[in-house]
UniProtKB/Swiss-Prot annotation:
Gene3D superfamilies: Cytochrome P450
Protein name in UniProt: Melianol synthase CYP71BQ17
Provenance organism: Ailanthus altissima (Tree-of-heaven)
Residues passing through the membrane, by range: 14-34
Function: Monooxygenase involved in the biosynthesis of quassinoids triterpene natural products such as ailanthone, chaparrinone, glaucarubinone and amarolide, allelopathic degraded triterpene lactones inhibiting the growth of other plants, and possessing antimalarial, antifeedant, insecticidal, anti-inflammatory and anticancer activities. Catalyzes the conversion of dihydroniloticin to the protolimonoid melianol.
Length: 516
């Protein structure tokens, strides 16, 4: 039986109930807490990082200076696993060898994918190159071709005479410079381009200057920090930024050069077949075409794919070798003690010779330490990019699927917890050390690591060793216009590689005359 309140029951004696707005506010707050808890639980433990702004994310924190320098500062603050929001992208930055090993080795299949970059999509013939193709059957086949056919140790050795010829051409030019100021950066890049051209195409490229200029433009815009990459869903922005027309202009010019090269090879091969002539020497384009012909029933290699791989070899091989030589010479000039020690070693080991051959390089232990130290301070690319295929745990943090992961080589090379006096150029730090740069020691991985490690390590190293040895053997070096060594500008540029901001201008004085 229900109890009724008497009509004269005073309202003041009724229990106090919250008002409707207060109740709704409390309910809304409670629901937000529940949602936050569910989202947090679903995300696991995200890596630490600065609070992002709407729309921009953390882009404003990379605007001051070079992106890899700004990211390294944030890594120092937040730790070896850093989370950033760059536009619409979730980016995780790894800056310790231990966590890099988790990404590149322990979980290498999950991180075998490279993130999509709009410029690369256009320039690599829709991701048909070895470097940028998606992880899968096509990539595995192309990787096999590169390791077994294109860039094997046997094939790299077969290009020895090409390397020696082109390095000697550089030495000849320097010998005739008569102590004038030389743009050494330009000459080094020209030399490496000639080496790669002859190895890849069988001759120097007829459009060498245009080809080099186009490569430089690709390196500048292919780093993955363009508006089209940071806001991938906003496709309407691409025409507005002018990136697409610029990319198409570069791609059309580059395609014309590559098309002519491949067509020339096909005509030459057809003529040889009609005359029953067997090639004594094959360049890399010949090797690709041979493979395509021999395996056409199992693996169809299109013309665009041949061009993509050819461009891959040329751009990666030339840029890596030249950038590393340029930085090595810069550091040697900046550090005369190291320069003197390296010169004394090569001049003693090759005493009495009018020129150095590649076989002499094996005696030059200190030169190899110089190259290691150059890779530590100046990795050809400041970041090694990967993408997570599935959600996983890395370094104690949850990495979502499709996250862009950057291995920060710039930060690891300058980490005081890894290296003593990390900002000093001291090749002796590697004396007696087993640390190499071939992907086995994650504190020094200038060529990456895991199954997507750069297949051209041997090729690049051979170019760098011979080029540096010859320049140190034959010449003494100084800066022009009486400039002091401490005034040498060591500023970097940012792109797919981290080249010097300013070209290296030097004066070379002949110490040991050269005879070809």
């Amino acid at each position: 039986m229900r109890t009724k309140l008497p009509m004269d029951f005073p309202i003041s004696k009724m229990p106090h109930l919250p008002s409707l707005p207060v109740s709704l506010s409390f309910l809304l707050f409670f629901l937000m807490l529940v949602r936050y808890w569910k989202n947090s639980k679903g995300q696991g433990k995200p890596p630490p990082g600065p609070r992002p702004l709407p729309i921009l994310g953390n882009l404003h924190q990379l605007a001051d200076g070079l992106p890899h320098h700004a990211v390294t500062k944030l890594c120092r603050k937040y730790g070896p696993v850093l989370k950033l929001k760059l536009g619409q992208l979730d980016v995780v930055v790894i800056s310790s060898p231990e966590v890099a090993k988790e990404v590149l080795k322990t979980n290498e299949i999950n991180f075998a994918q490279r993130p999509e970059v709009y410029a690369v999509e256009i320039m690599s013939y829709d991701h048909s190159s070895i470097v940028f193709s998606p992880y899968g059957d096509y990539w595995r086949e192309m990787r096999k071709i590169s390791v077994l056919e294109l860039l094997s140790n046997r094939r790299v050795l077969s290009f020895r005479s090409i390397r020696e010829d082109e390095v000697w051409n550089l030495v000849e030019f320097l010998s005739s410079s008569d102590e004038r100021t030389i743009n050494l950066s330009e000459k080094i890049f020209s030399m490496t381009n000639d080496i790669i051209s002859r190895a890849a195409f069988g001759r120097k490229c007829n459009d060498q200057h245009n080809f080099t200029v186009l490569l430089e433009e690709i390196m500048k815009i292919g780093a993955g920090f363009a508006i089209a990459d940071l806001y991938p869903s906003l496709t309407f922005l691409r025409p507005l930024t002018g990136v697409k027309p610029a990319l198409m202009r570069i791609q059309n010019k580059m395609d014309k050069i590559l098309e002519d090269i491949v067509t020339e090879h096909r005509i030459k091969r057809k003529a040889a077949a009609n005359s029953n002539i067997k090639f004594e020497e094959e360049d890399l384009v010949d090797t690709l075409l041979n493979y395509a012909e021999a395996n056409k029933d199992e693996f169809h290699l299109t013309l665009d794919q041949v061009k993509a791989v050819t461009l891959d070899i040329f751009s990666a091989g030339s840029e890596t070798s030249a950038t590393s030589m340029e930085w090595a010479m810069s550091e040697l000039l900046k550090n005369p003690r190291v320069m003197k020690k390296a010169q004394e070693e090569v001049r003693q080991a090759c005493k009495g010779k009018s020129k150095i051959r590649e076989a002499d390089i094996q005696k030059l232990d200190y030169l190899k330490l110089v190259i290691k130290e150059t890779f530590r301070l100046h990795a050809p690319g400041p970041f090694t990019p990967r993408e997570s295929r599935e959600r996983c745990e890395i370094g104690g943090y949850t990495i979502p699927a499709k996250a862009k992961v950057l291995i920060n080589l710039h930060a690891m090379g300058r980490d005081p917890t890894i290296w003593t006096d990390p900002d000093c150029f001291q090749p002796e730090r590697f004396q007696g050390s087993s640390v190499d740069f071939k992907g086995n020691h994650f504190e020094l991985i200038p060529f990456g690591g895991g199954r997507r490690i750069c297949p051209g390590i041997s090729f690049a190293t051979a170019n760098i060793e011979l080029g540096l040895a010859q320049m140190l053997y034959h010449f003494d070096w100084k800066l022009p216009n009486g400039k002091k060594l401490e005034d040498l500008d060591m500023s970097e540029n940012f792109g797919m590689t981290a080249r010097r901001k300013e070209n290296l201008q030097v004066i070379a004085t002949t110490h040991i005359p050269f005879q070809k």
